[in-house]
Amino acid sequence: MAFPTTSAQQAETNRKILEEIQTKKQLLAGGIINLGLSPPNQMPAPQLLGQPTTVNPDFQAGVGIATNATSTARSAFNPTSSTTLGFFIPQDSYFGNSFIPVLPRLEPLPSPATTPTTPNAPPSHSISK
């Protein structure tokens, strides 16, 4: 019989699973897994409105991206961070949000009620008796 028996297949599958678990335990114990946190000196400076956004080469190369980020997230990170006014902080998340957006604060536009009026303007309504 050329095919392995089902018990041999099950034993092989179990062995592979146990090896994978052991490898993950060693990585966690050794602190090798990157949590996606970067030191504050690697954070890009916030940009002002109207100025082109420049990306830190480490972030553009994917160094700041968490190692467990999917390839889709990595491919979305680079173009997005180079075309936005803000920047993104990579993080390790179990909920799928691998990047936190950081947007600049904008000054509020002046409201029409606070605009100065001319003193010689005619009154808009008159009172009649």
Swiss-Prot record:
One of its GO terms (biological process) is DNA repair. Residues 105-129 are annotated as: Disordered. GO terms for cellular component: nucleoplasm; SOSS complex. Signal peptide: none annotated. It comes from the Eukaryota. It holds the Pfam family SOSSC. InterPro entries: SOSSC (IPR031821). Belongs to the SOSS-C family. This is SOSS complex subunit C homolog.
